[in-house]
């Protein structure tokens, strides 16, 4: 075989490789690559953004959600055994001795009067109650109660929970309180202490109102 023939065959093989690569790129684009670059991730995989950096309502948390963590609740485990315990117990989510993952609760945190002007945001954010609020909010996926671990774990929704099944269904009264909290953040552009969130109570008083769930 002459040198010329060998060079010709190598050139043809290289050209076939280039054509195959181009076809592969076009194939990726036809599978939903989107955008000007066919190797980019499709638009449908982009994470949604929150509008106005919304926050959950602190007033509703401290009056309605936090007390749930201290309730003696019946629990069912996968092996069929049952028990009665609190979420804030020392073996669960207690801030000092808990073993229940990142979610932590200070059980004896005291409520704060949000109608008292002396309780400024800085003072509230330094309190134990706010630490509980901050920890609980970290277990929330905005806009999704089923993806929020603060509900998904005690309901065993596609995730393990060492504390067993706490809420049988989304209709559990305590689960409904947490759902309402997740689904009703403070209005966009306001902070977690906004008086607009007081409508989550009937009457709209964070100190005396009852906790709405719908």
Task: State what each model feature region is.
Residues 50-54, 85-90, 94-95, 99-214:
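Electron-transfer interface patches adjacent to heme c in soluble/periplasmic c-type cytochromes
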Residues 59-93, 177-178:
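Sequence/structural segment immediately N-terminal to covalent heme-attachment motifs in c-type
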């Amino acid at each position: 075989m002459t040198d010329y023939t060998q060079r010709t065959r190598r050139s043809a093989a290289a050209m076939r490789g280039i054509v195959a690569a181009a076809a592969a790129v076009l194939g990726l684009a036809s599978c939903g690559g989107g955008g000007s670059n066919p190797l980019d991730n499709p638009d449908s995989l982009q994470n949604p953004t929150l509008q106005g950096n919304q926050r959950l309502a602190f007033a509703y948390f401290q009056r309605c959600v936090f007390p749930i963590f201290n309730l003696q609740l019946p629990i069912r485990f996968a092996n069929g055994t049952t028990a009665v315990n609190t979420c804030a117990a020392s073996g669960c989510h207690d801030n000092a001795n808990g073993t229940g993952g990142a979610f932590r609760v200070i059980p004896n945190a005291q409520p704060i009067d949000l109608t008292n002007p002396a309780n400024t945001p800085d003072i509230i954010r330094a309190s134990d109650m706010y630490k509980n609020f901050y920890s609980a909010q970290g277990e929330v996926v905005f806009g999704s109660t089923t993806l929020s671990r603060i509900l998904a774990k005690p309901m065993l929704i596609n995730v393990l929970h060492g504390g067993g099944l706490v809420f049988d269904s989304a209709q559990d009264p305590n689960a409904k309180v947490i759902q309402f909290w997740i689904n009703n953040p403070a209005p966009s552009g306001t902070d977690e202490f906004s008086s607009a969130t007081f409508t989550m109570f009937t009457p709209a008083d964070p100190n005396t109102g009852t906790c709405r769930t719908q």
